[in-house]
């Protein structure tokens, strides 16, 4: 058989032409030790803080510590199969998450991966998780109201768009209920909501999602869940993932609301990570930068200036206290970062005062300038009246022979407490709140409060039936308040006439 040189060279040329070997160059290191989801890796000299690493099995990791001869990284996923000596690759990527309208109505994990079984997100945009908060020049003072639908909050501790208002209280005092009611109340208000569940039971998160679906709120809400069974790094990252998704709407000139439920659990997850990374512990074994953990997160909530598109991001962080102790480390940190706090008290909750807001120590530092004029007109003296009632009620326990003025103050205070009670998942529009508070605080032509003759235990029913009556007979009153956002003489006259008419048909039971 004759071997022809030209044929051999042709075959070799064809083989070379089809050969397309790709050389993949990656900086790799090996694991020195791995414990509870934190790995120490040798050999990644070029790694950057916050960079993503690739562990065996495609599991991602996040660089947290950069030391002289090794790197400390948190493993973002199951870590049971990862052993000492396993190779780890640098990706050169900084952690980023999907953002955009595609996330509305979805449930995602702490890294933005869908966990609701409804397929991929198909998001067109991605953003880095850690970015700098807007500076002073880019901001504008808070001036637009963000209604919660709860009389006790909208009247006494109003919240504005772009504000950070802390909700704190012991476990089972209704903190999540306040947050969920706020989401439900903003249906149709062009407010995009983000609910971040940190370290909660999966059954609790499922219940929240069911509630939002039931009331049609899921279409403008995204739920970010890092449950109790997720690794500590996921619980630490989830709030940053949520705020990155919410910032997309803020920066495009729209309005967003983010709820962190709750930041106490994020601080615990961060403490766990820091101790495993052998960072020096401080007070209550938290690391020295636990304040910065929350401040850099909450500073990203802002009301942007007109030049920046006038968008806003409002934050409602939740903190769980132990036995009502607001002076503990994490609560005081977050109180000092936020623009006010709503304190929920277990004693009030058990007495049936729900929402169980302690009006005395709850405050909104910037929300007053965002409150509508009509609410200021009717609720101006409400906080002072309630404070006087609480003071007198404490003294009245010791004496039985009280003068008439004291008895009147106590009777008025009892009715005001009843006036502010509200059922769960029953938020009220601001104009209906104004009507109810007007009926509770203003006087008729005889100088008596409109609800003075109503027995205390029937005030809640009176308020409910009053709204039903006005909706049926005088719908124009609420409409006028909603349009003018103030109570002029004409509206007051119509409201007084309607209250007089209602007083004639309201039946006192018993």
Curated annotation (Swiss-Prot):
UniProt keyword terms in alphabetical order: ATP synthesis, ATP-binding, Cell inner membrane, Cell membrane, CF(1), Hydrogen ion transport, Ion transport, Membrane, Nucleotide-binding, Translocase, Transport
Membrane topology: Peripheral membrane protein
Assembly information from the UniProt record: F-type ATPases have 2 components, CF(1) - the catalytic core - and CF(0) - the membrane proton channel. CF(1) has five subunits: alpha(3), beta(3), gamma(1), delta(1), epsilon(1). CF(0) has three main subunits: a(1), b(2) and c(9-12). The alpha and beta chains form an alternating ring which encloses part of the gamma chain. CF(1) is attached to CF(0) by a central stalk formed by the gamma and epsilon chains, while a peripheral stalk is formed by the delta and b chains.
The protein's Enzyme Commission number: 7.1.2.2
Protein name per its UniProtKB record: ATP synthase subunit alpha
Catalysed reaction equations from the record: ATP + H2O + 4 H(+)(in) = ADP + phosphate + 5 H(+)(out)
Family, per entry: Belongs to the ATPase alpha/beta chains family.
Signal peptide: none
UniProt GO MF annotations: ADP binding; ATP binding; proton-transporting ATP synthase activity, rotational mechanism
A Pfam entry, by short name: ATP-synt_ab_N
Function: Produces ATP from ADP in the presence of a proton gradient across the membrane. The alpha chain is a regulatory subunit.
């Amino acid at each position: 058989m004759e071997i022809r040189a030209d044929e051999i060279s042709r075959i070799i040329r064809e083989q070379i032409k089809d050969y397309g070997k790709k050389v993949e160059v990656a900086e790799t290191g090996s694991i020195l030790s791995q414990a509870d989801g934190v790995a120490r890796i040798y050999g990644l000299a070029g790694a950057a803080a916050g960079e993503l690493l690739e562990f065996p099995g495609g599991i991602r990791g996040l660089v947290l510590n950069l030391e002289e001869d090794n790197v400390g990284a948190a493993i973002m996923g199951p870590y049971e199969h990862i052993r000492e000596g396993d190779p780890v690759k640098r990706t050169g990527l900084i952690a980023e998450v999907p953002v955009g309208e595609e996330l509305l109505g979805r449930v995602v994990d702490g890294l933005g991966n869908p966990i609701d079984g409804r397929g991929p997100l198909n998001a067109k945009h991605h953003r880095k998780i850690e970015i700098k908060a807007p500076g002073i020049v880019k901001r504008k003072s808070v001036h637009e109201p963000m209604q919660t639908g709860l009389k006790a909050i909208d009247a006494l501790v109003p919240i504005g768009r772009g504000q950070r208002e802390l909700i704190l209280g012991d476990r089972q005092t209704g903190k999540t209920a306040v947050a969920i009611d706020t989401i439900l109340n903003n249906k149709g208000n062009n407010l995009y909501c983000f609910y971040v569940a940190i370290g909660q039971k999966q059954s609790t998160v499922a219940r929240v999602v069911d509630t939002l679906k039931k009331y049609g709120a899921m279409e403008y809400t995204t739920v970010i869940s890092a449950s109790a069974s997720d690794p500590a790094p996921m619980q630490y990252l989830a709030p940053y993932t949520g705020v990155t998704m919410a910032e997309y709407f803020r920066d495009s000139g729209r309005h967003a609301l983010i709820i962190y439920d709750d930041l106490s659990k994020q601080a615990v997850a961060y403490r766990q990570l820091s101790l495993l990374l052998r960072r020096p512990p401080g007070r209550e074994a938290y690391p020295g930068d636990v304040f910065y953990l929350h401040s850099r997160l909450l500073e990203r909530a802002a009301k942007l200036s007109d030049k920046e598109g006038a968008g806003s991001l409002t934050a409602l962080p939740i903190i769980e206290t132990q036995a009502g102790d607001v002076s503990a480390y994490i609560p005081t940190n977050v109180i000092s970062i936020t623009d006010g706090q709503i304190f929920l008290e277990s004693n009030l909750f058990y007495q049936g005062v729900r929402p169980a807001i302690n009006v005395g120590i709850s405050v909104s530092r910037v929300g007053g300038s965002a409150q509508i004029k009509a609410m200021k007109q009717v609720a101006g003296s409400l906080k002072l009246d309630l404070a006087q009632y609480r003071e007198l009620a404490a003294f009245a326990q010791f004496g039985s022979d009280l003068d008439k003025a004291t008895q009147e103050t106590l009777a008025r205070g009892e009715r005001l407490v009843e006036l502010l009670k509200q059922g769960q998942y029953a938020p009220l529009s601001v104009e209906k709140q104004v009507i109810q508070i007007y009926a509770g605080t203003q006087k008729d032509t005889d100088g008596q409060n409109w609800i003075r003759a109503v027995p205390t235990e029937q005030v809640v029913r009176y308020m409910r039936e009053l709204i039903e009556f006005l909706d049926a007979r005088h719908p124009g009153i609420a409409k006028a308040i909603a349009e003018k956002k103030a109570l002029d003489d004409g509206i007051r006259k119509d409201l007084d006439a309607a209250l007089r008419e209602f007083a004639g048909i309201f039946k006192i039971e018993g």
